[in-house]
A protein has these predicted regions:
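Short beta-strand/helix segments in adaptor/scaffold domains that form protein-protein interfaces
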Residues: 1-128
Length: 128
């Protein structure tokens, strides 16, 4: 796929650089656009998972998106019984293909770090 925006990037930027950049944009979008979203039920969780997936797939060069939200419901059942999405509740995998490079990036809560870590899971480059 031709990229009409490529001319705005430095000529030093490789396909690998752009694939990694685009993967970071996708994860940043998920974290900064959707954290704070109110959730009350498992149905809300499923709808939000699908919304995040569709939003990220709408961005350029996305091949695949997987979203899982970890949700613990409070047993009170009252009118104020809801929670809001946090980055640590998301398990997100995004696959981006730009030029000759494919990147799988992940956002996942790492208990050892007590942090929702965004990281590169895999990089593949096609040999020409």
């Amino acid at each position: 796929m031709e990229d009409p925006a490529a001319k705005y990037f430095s000529t030093k930027v490789t396909s690998r650089d752009r694939a990694v950049f685009e993967a970071g944009v996708a994860i940043g979008t998920a974290v900064h656009q959707f954290t704070g979203t109110p959730l009350k039920s498992l149905e809300d969780v499923r709808v939000l998972e699908e919304a995040i997936k569709r939003a990220l797939l709408a961005q350029p060069f996305r091949e695949r998106v997987e979203v899982k939200i970890h949700f613990e419901r409070s047993p009170s059942g009252g009118p104020y019984d809801y929670t809001t999405l946090r980055a640590r509740d998301m398990d997100l995998r995004v696959v981006v293909k730009y030029g000759s490079c494919r990147v799988a990036a992940r956002l996942k809560y790492i208990k050892e770090l007590d942090y929702a870590l965004a990281y590169i899971e895999d990089i593949e480059e096609e040999v020409k």
